[in-house]
Amino acid sequence: MQFELLSTSAGARRGRLTLAHGAVETPVFMPVGTYGTVKAMTPAMLSDVGAQICLGNTFHLWLRPGLDIVGAHGGLHRFMGWDKPILTDSGGFQVFSLGALRKISEEGVKFASPIDGARLFLTPEISMQIQTVLNSDVVMIFDECTPYPATRDEAAKSMRLSRRWARRSRDEFDRLENANALFGIVQGGMYEDLRDESLGALQDIGFHGFAIGGLSVGEPKDDMARILAHTAPRLPADKPRYLMGVGTPEDIVDGIANGIDMFDCVMPTRNARNGWLFTRYGDLKIKNAVHKADTRPLDPSCSCYTCRNFSRSYLHHLHRAGEILGSMLNTVHNLHYYQTLTAELRDAIAADRFADYVTRFRSERATGAH
């Protein structure tokens, strides 16, 4: 893995991340393909909207279809028909999401399979082994996502467990001679000094990139902004910086302003399937009756396949009728919007006009999609 910092503007960074399956221009938004597919999108459609890298989910792919199946294809790229880079999360967040169904110990996490109830055990070592079979370009360490709310003692205990798991993840990654990139994840809840302690330990271990985890897990926006503003500038400047699970277009712009390079979130795809569409001039809900006879495109400034060919009225009809095509066209548009946003931000940083772009972005988004 190689990361080049190409330019900066008002704290924002323009870079290039070179991975085993290609180069990724940053800042970058990564669509989420939990089960080896970005919902309602073919790989060709994903490429057409400008996606450079996508996510796979270690936890879910381990459970179904299983490592033997993916391994028989030589890894996740061939299995899902995607020849560009893939990042896999470690399974830590999914285990965290199981709540009472899981039991965390020093060794790892015991839990009941959400598919068939089978008793399973996931450890840092097993997570690294799974991700090595998946052959993802970026591997994430196995950590515990600190819940919100958490007392200081709870956050400290969770972070220090993640710190020990980070060491074990690194050791197993090296033992496996995995030639891909391994990212560490900074935890520590809503406590700045715990975030600093986590980052220091991760730097001592050594990773190819650094992520901020444990945000956008239910905390108030002010707390998220505070921890992001504190933590992001402290991440190593010569390594890629990744804000996990974030977020809205505004969240992404705020993250980039704080020096973040990489983002992922289910929001554009999940919202698309629910008829919530993002545009340059605000968001709209296509199910609303106001769109029933509206012959305009979603966004006259958008060049996506959906906006070039279909009206709001047709998309409203598809959504009301429950047609699969509605989810597909909505997802094409939302992902194209996110990819266009990050492409424009890359250009603005390169031209040293990031602050001007953000001012215009906020003004346009505030007008409301009419």
From Swiss-Prot:
Transmembrane segments: none
Cofactor list: Zn(2+)
UniProt keyword list: Glycosyltransferase, Metal-binding, Queuosine biosynthesis, Transferase, tRNA processing, Zinc
GO cellular component: a single term: cytosol
Region (RNA binding): 245-251, 269-273
Gene3D superfamilies the UniProt entry points to: Queuine tRNA-ribosyltransferase-like (3.20.20.105)
Gene Ontology biological-process entries: queuosine biosynthetic process; tRNA wobble guanine modification; tRNA-guanine transglycosylation
List of catalytic residues: D89, D264
Ligand binding (substrate): D89, S90, G91, G92, F93, D143, Q187, G214
Enzyme Commission code(s) on record: 2.4.2.29
EC class: transferase
Cofactor binding description: Binds 1 zinc ion per subunit.
Cross-referenced Pfam families: TGT
Function description: Catalyzes the base-exchange of a guanine (G) residue with the queuine precursor 7-aminomethyl-7-deazaguanine (PreQ1) at position 34 (anticodon wobble position) in tRNAs with GU(N) anticodons (tRNA-Asp, -Asn, -His and -Tyr). Catalysis occurs through a double-displacement mechanism. The nucleophile active site attacks the C1' of nucleotide 34 to detach the guanine base from the RNA, forming a covalent enzyme-RNA intermediate. The proton acceptor active site deprotonates the incoming PreQ1, allowing a nucleophilic attack on the C1' of the ribose to form the product.
Subunit and interaction comment: Homodimer. Within each dimer, one monomer is responsible for RNA recognition and catalysis, while the other monomer binds to the replacement base PreQ1.
Descriptive protein name: Queuine tRNA-ribosyltransferase
Species annotation: Azoarcus sp. (strain BH72)
Gene name of this polypeptide: tgt
